[in-house]
UniProtKB/Swiss-Prot annotation:
One of its GO terms (cellular component) is vacuolar membrane. NCBIfam families: MIP. It is found in: Vacuole membrane. InterPro entries: Aquaporin-like, Aquaporin_transptr, MIP, MIP_CS. Pfam families: MIP. One of its GO terms (biological process) is water transport. SUPFAM superfamilies: Aquaporin-like (SSF81338). This is Probable aquaporin TIP3-1. The chain crosses the membrane at residues 28-48, 62-82, 105-125, 149-169, 176-196, 224-244.
Length: 264
């Protein structure tokens, strides 16, 4: 698993200037780019393929199929990246880890750029390989207000970030760490079953950004940034400061040690 889980957190840090060109930072960014592209291609592709097979996708069976595809795709994406970059595959997860002091701001910026580019490239590849099918994007269901959706996105992403912290970052995760990709992936799928009919269950700004840019659909787009960032940020702070004992997070009486270049 990621060495990030064994590193002390507890303090927001900008990072050192050399972090921007350090090979570990570049490798981690490439890992996030590829993992996010893998996830978005399979996730968005499952929706496009369902639309190809059936005229009406808004059925219980369709929701289950798309949720399962998202769950499995995220599990694989996290698994292939967790030992290199921490397997965030989500700007909101990166934000939660940043607030918890688990990576520097410089590295977080590289992660965000890589994740967004990965989502855009995956969506473009889907449009190219499907003969120009337009990605459906995300939208609010009838009767769902903007702030209802923000709260829903925050709640679902809070759970996702909490699960990530518990299975990937927590120093005492033990053997639970071996199921981290499945735990995070299955929770994403479960949240899609719960929230999909209301706002599409984004939980991942990169996942929403790719189809929005390629399909040029920006209505309510801010909802899928604000909600996940608030939820992930709260979960990261809660787990870092209330769940992880201070002795595990910061040795020598809580003294902070600067993040090493290999930290995620």
């Amino acid at each position: 698993m990621s060495t990030a889980a064994a590193r002390p957190g507890r303090r927001f840090t900008v990072g050192r200037s050399e972090d921007a060109t350090h090979p570990d930072t570049i490798r981690a960014a490439i890992s996030e780019f590829l993992a996010t592209a893998i996830f978005v291609f399979a996730a968005e592709g499952s929706i496009l393929s369902l639309g190809k097979l059936y005229q009406d996708m808004s059925t219980p069976g369709g929701l289950v199929a798309v949720s399962l595809a998202h769950a499995l795709a995220l599990a694989v994406a996290v698994a292939v990246a967790v030992n290199i970059s921490g397997g965030h595959v989500n700007p909101a997860i990166t934000f939660g880890a940043l607030l918890g002091g688990r990576l520097s701001l410089i590295r977080a910026l590289f992660y965000w750029l890589a994740q967004l580019l990965g989502a855009v490239v995956a969506t473009l590849l889907l449009r190219l390989t499907t003969g120009g099918m337009r990605p459906p994007g995300f939208a609010l269901a009838s009767g769902v207000g903007d702030w209802h959706a923000v709260l829903l996105e925050a709640t679902m992403t809070f759970g996702l970030m909490y699960a990530y912290y518990a299975t990937v970052i927590d120093p005492k995760r033990g053997h639970v760490g071996t199921i981290a990709p499945l735990a995070v992936g299955f929770l994403l799928g479960a949240n899609m079953l719960a929230g999909g009919p209301f706002d599409g269950a984004g939980m991942n700004p990169a996942r929403v950004f790719g189809p929005a840019l390629v399909g040029w659909r920006w209505r309510h787009h801010w909802v899928y940034w604000l909600g996940p960032f608030v939820g992930a940020g709260l979960a990261g702070l809660l787990y870092e400061y209330l769940v992880i004992p201070s002795a595990d997070a910061a040795p020598h009486g809580g003294a902070h040690q600067p993040l090493a270049p290999e930290d995620y």
